[in-house]
């Protein structure tokens, strides 16, 4: 009974440690999706034309994804950019 109890305590400690760990640290080696800015069409305006409308427009144009993004720098206006 002592071994079973020790194993259960160890299992619960490991489970607790995993659940409390920071997910960003666990996924720090993941690559972000990269896309070309060649297919940026509509200007994104908060409250009027956002990520949802951008995604719908891009899928209607035959792309898999669409996101509101700056073309080159943070100072540039945000456009709807489509990519696969």
Swiss-Prot record:
Endpoints of the signal sequence: 1-29
Disulfide bonds listed in the record: 40-82, 44-68, 54-80, 58-81
An example Gene Ontology biological process: killing of cells of another organism
Cellular component terms per the entry's GO annotation: extracellular region
One Pfam entry name: Defensin
Subcellular location: Secreted
Lineage: superkingdom: Eukaryota
Chief location bin: secreted
Keyword hit for 4Fe-4S: no
Keywords: Antimicrobial, Disulfide bond, Fungicide, Plant defense, Secreted, Signal
Protein family (similarity comment): Belongs to the DEFL family.
Name used for this protein in its record: Defensin-like protein 49
């Amino acid at each position: 009974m002592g071994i079973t109890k020790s194993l259960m305590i160890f299992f619960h400690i490991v489970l607790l440690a995993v659940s409390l760990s920071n997910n960003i640290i666990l996924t720090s080696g993941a690559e972000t999706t990269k896309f070309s800015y060649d297919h940026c069409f509509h200007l994104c305006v908060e409250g009027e034309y956002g990520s949802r409308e951008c995604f719908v427009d891009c899928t209607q144009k035959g792309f898999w994804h669409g996101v509101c993004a700056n073309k080159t720098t943070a100072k540039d206006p945000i456009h709807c950019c489509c990519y696969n």
